Amino acid sequence: MHRNLAATVLCCLAAFAPKAPASDAPTLDNRWAHITTALFCTSQDVDKLLTKPEDRAAALAYFAPLKLSKFYLENGSGDPAAVPVLRDVAAALRAQGYEVSGAVVPSNRGPLCYNDPKDMALLESKVKVLAQVFDEIIVDDWLFTTCTCATCVEERGSQSWADYRSRLVAEQSKIHLIDAARQVRPGVKVIIKYPTWYEGHRQNGYDVARQTPQFDGVSVGIETRQPTTQDQHIPTYSGYVLQKWIGGNAGAKWRSAWLDNYQMEGADDDFVAEVGQAVLARAPEIIFWCAGVLHPPRASASNYPHLAAMMPEFDRLAGLLEGPSRGIPMHLPIGSVGEYNIFGYLGMIGLPIDPRESVPEDTKAAIFTKHSLADPKIADEILARMRGGKEVFLTWPLLQALRQSELGRVLNVISEGGTVSSPIFRTHEGLWETKPIDAGRPFTFPRIELSTWPYARDVGLVREDADFGILMRTSYLGGQVDVLNLPDNTYDLERLPAEVLDAIRLCFFDELGVRLTGPGGVALYPFGSRQYVLYNMNEASEKVSLRFPKTAPVRGWRETMVGRDLPATPVDGGQGPWARHEIDVALTLKPFEIAVVEAP
C-alpha cells in the first residue's frame, strides 16, 4: 500500500472530471463491503456541486471511487430560503440511494462568544433551518470558544478558563443548539464532533465527560495531517488512539471518524494514513472533509487520486481484521492532558496503545504519563500495582511530579537539570554486559545522573563525564518500575537507534506476548491472539521483525495483505538468567505499506 498505486487510477479519474453525464447513475449497490464512507459538503460545496442536476451528476461520478454511503450537507446561514434548496438536494441524493444528514458550522467568523446574543441567535437560526429538512445534524468542531471579552472575563470570576468555558459551552449549546433543533423537529439527533487538539478541549469549551452524555452521537477527529510540518505536529498514530479513547468512551454513541487533508499537498501517504488509523480503530463511519477541497480546481485535490487508489486496499484490510484489538494499557482519564500526544509518539515506535480511563488493575504492565495526574490518587494507585507484583512504566515528567510520594525514592538520582547531548547510547545486555551504539548524530535529553548502584540504566546516553538515564528499570516494593526519559525533540523518539527502541519495547513483551524489533515509524496493531498488523509510515522501506516466545511455531506464518509465506527463525539468546530464546518472524515493508501477519 504505497504511492505507485495512485498512478493506476489517474487516467480513470480523468473520466470523473467535472462534466455532466446525462443523468445520475444509481449507486445503491456500489458500497464497500467492510467500511462505511461519507462526505461532508460545505454550503459552498452544495451550491457549486450539488444544486444543479448536471453538476450533481458530475460530482457523484467524480466521487464514485469513494463508494460513499452518506452525505452531510451544511447550511451556512439562518435564511429560511435555504430550506427548499436543501430539501431538493437531499431528496435527489436519497433517490440515488444515499443517506443524507445536515451539518452546521456554528460560527461564520471564528470562535463563538456564548455571551453574545447575536452569536447565539445565528447558531439557533442555522440549526432551525437544518431541522426542517434533516433527522440528524452533525456539528463541526467550531463549537469551541476563545472569547476574552469583558463579559466573559467578568462571568468567569475566579474560575479557570477550562472550568468556566466547559460549563458555559455545554449549557448554551444545550439551549441554542440541541433544544433549538428539537423545537422544530422533536426527534432530531445532534452529533458532536470533537477536534484532534485534545490538549485544549476543556480550555476552549469541549468537555468529553460532560458533552458525550448530552449529545446523541460522537464523531472524533483524525486531522493528524503532515506530522512534522503542519502547525499542530500530531503523530499519525494519535488518530488511532483518539478513536479508541474518546470514541470508545462514547460506547454506542460513537458514530464516526472525521478526517481532512488541510495543508497536505504533496503528502498523499500521510493523508491516507489518516484513513488507515480509522480503519484499524474500526470506526463505524469515515467522514471526508470536504467535497470542495478534494475536487478541482483546489490544489488540495491533488491528494484525491491516491486516496481513491487506496480505498479498495483499506476495505480489504478491514475485512481481514479478526478478534478484538489489543495493546498496552495506558492510563488516560477522560479530559486529561499531559506530555503532548505522547500516546501517539509511543505508538509510532511500535508500542500498541490501549487507552484506559481508570488505572488498569488486571494487567502485567501499564503505562502512566502526566495525563495520570488528573487522578488525585494516582501515586497510591501506582504503588498498589507495584505491591501487587505488577510492572509500571512511567515517563520521567510524571515521576518528577510525584517525587513527594514514595515513588520519588525509586531511583537514586544524584544530579539533574538542564540537558545533555550525545550521539552515543549504551544498552544493558546482562549483568556485566553492555553494548555501545553510535546513532550517527547527537540526541538531546533532560539530564538525569544516577548512582552506579542500584544499576538502573537499561539505556544510557554516553558522554565523557557520565552515562545519563534514558530508560531506567528497577524493582521496588515487589514490582517492576520502568522510567522513560523523553528527548527534547519528542519526534526524536521515532529516530532513536533500533537497538534503543528494542530495549523500550522489551518492557512490554510479557504483557503482549510479542515485540517489534527494528526502526521507529512502524506501528504495531495486534488483533485477537494470532493477528498482527504492521504499518510502515516511513518514506523508506524498513526491515522489521516480530519476536515471539520460544514456544511459538516456526512454520505456517503468513502475510495476508499480499499473500506470502513468512520465515520464522529460532533466536538463540545464549545462556544465563538474561538469555532470551525467541522466534523471529522477519519481513521488509515498503514505504507506507500495511502488512497483516497471521500466526498458524
Residue locations for each model-derived region?
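Bacterial N-terminal signal peptides
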Residues: 6-17
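Sec/Tat signal peptide C-region and signal peptidase I cleavage site
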Residues: 19-21
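Glycan-processing catalytic domains of CAZymes
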Residues: 23-378, 384-387, 396-404, 469-477, ...
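A conserved amphipathic helix/loop scaffold
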Residues: 370-600
